[in-house]
Amino acid sequence: MCTLEKRGDLFLLTLTGEDEHRFHPDTIASVLSLLEQAKSQSTKGSVLITTGHGKFFSNGFDLAWAQSAGHGAIKRMHQMVKSFKPVLAALLDLPMPTIAALNGHAAASGLMFALSHDYVFMRKDRGVLYMSEVDIGLPVPDYFSALVVAKVGSGIARRELLLSGKKLKGEEAVALGIVDSAAHDSAEGVVEATVSLGESLAAKKWNGEVYATIRKSLYPELCRMVDLTANNLATHNL
């Protein structure tokens, strides 16, 4: 399902297996638990890198699980939307820089998971970003929209992401300012690039709590939507 490995100052969270890494309630709980573990073990210089195995980074919520409930499908969808919110809140509140290394496709809530990181790297050779909701007739959760507004600066890019049903490849996603890099020819290459960035960030030995507070202050509306508050900076270090 997912694992957390510590390599010096770096935490590597991996969505394991060759499946689509759909966010089922059990997967959501597992990811949240590992983020809490990384937070509890963090020190000055800690950095989180998140990646996956196989063709998909994550293909979104487990729609098949929801639909298997028949008349209870809507209730299950609401359950996943509600339980996923703390995952994004945990990433925004994590006292360290965060980097998403997209090994493959990132769609719907899988893309929102990626964009909740401070940096997003894609592969050049494969993988797309895709917000499928407009194509399949599902409304976008309000906190997803708040995340896109917070993290994607251009109105054109937001339109392409949410209103076009377009599958964006790496170079186009970089050009639109959605991801930071897409110059990597393999899953290993994108992880290596994020490890290099992670090590350079770790060397700065920043105070993680201060880092998280500044991050939250950048996105006040998003933090409100995911039930976080941007606490004032502690003054004892000033």
From Swiss-Prot:
Its EC number is 5.3.3.8. One of its GO terms (molecular function) is delta(3)-delta(2)-enoyl-CoA isomerase activity. Able to isomerize both 3-cis and 3-trans double bonds into the 2-trans form in a range of enoyl-CoA species. Essential for the beta oxidation of unsaturated fatty acids. The keyword Signal does not apply. Pathway: Lipid metabolism; fatty acid beta-oxidation. One of its GO terms (biological process) is fatty acid beta-oxidation. It comes from Arabidopsis thaliana. It catalyses: a (3Z)-enoyl-CoA = a 4-saturated (2E)-enoyl-CoA; a (3E)-enoyl-CoA = a 4-saturated (2E)-enoyl-CoA. InterPro entries: ClpP/crotonase-like_dom_sf, Enoyl-CoA_hydra/iso. The record marks E133 as: Important for catalytic activity. Belongs to the enoyl-CoA hydratase/isomerase family. The keyword Ribosomal protein does not apply. It is found in: Cytoplasm; Nucleus. This is Enoyl-CoA delta isomerase 3. GO terms for cellular component: cytosol; nucleus. The gene is ECI3. It comes from the Eukaryota. Its main location: cytoplasm. Keywords: Cytoplasm, Fatty acid metabolism, Isomerase, Lipid metabolism, Nucleus. Pfam families: ECH_1 (PF00378).
